[in-house]
């Protein structure tokens, strides 16, 4: 389970952002997780809930997870399609000259603070 490492990295980034903006307490954090990022949202949330208990800045902070759809682009027919449904093979022209546009990333979208 690598989700714990991703949670620790996210918490480190949140601390840096909070320090730069003189934030003392965070109410909620929105994290975007790509459909093919290999991070399982349920495990991420479980690790988050465990990790923030030790963090005064984040204690009781709500975690909001938003999925990023996995979209693949076909270089031959220049169309986009759902990676989850079709994988690497383009459903329009059957080409395998494709690459992932979105869905592999994990990013902090929003941090809501308490004044």
Region locations from a protein language model:
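Long, charged N-terminal interaction/targeting segments
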Residues: 1-61
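Short loop/turn motifs enriched for small/polar and acidic residues
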Residues: 32-36, 66-70, 111
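Short, flexible, mixed-charge glycine/proline-rich loop motifs
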Residues: 62-69, 79-84
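Cys/His-enriched microdomains
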Residues: 72, 88, 106
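Short cysteine-rich clusters marking metal-coordination/redox-active sites
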Residues: 74-77, 90-93
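Short functional micro-motifs and their immediate structural scaffolds
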Residues: 82, 95-99
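Short metal-binding segments enriched for Cys and/or His
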Residues: 100-110
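Short acidic DE-rich linear segments
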Residues: 114-115
């Amino acid at each position: 389970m690598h989700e714990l490492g991703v949670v620790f990295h996210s918490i480190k980034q949140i601390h840096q952002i909070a320090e730069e903006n003189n934030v003392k307490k965070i109410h909620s954090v929105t994290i975007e997780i790509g459909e093919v990022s290999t991070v399982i949202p349920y495990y991420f949330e479980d690790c988050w809930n465990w990790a923030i208990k030790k963090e005064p800045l984040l204690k009781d902070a709500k975690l909001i997870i938003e999925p990023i759809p996995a979209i693949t682009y076909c270089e031959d027919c220049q169309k986009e399609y759902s990676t989850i449904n079709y994988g690497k093979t383009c459903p329009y022209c059957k080409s395998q000259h494709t690459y992932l546009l979105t869905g592999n990333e994990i990013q902090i979208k929003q941090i809501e603070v308490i004044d």
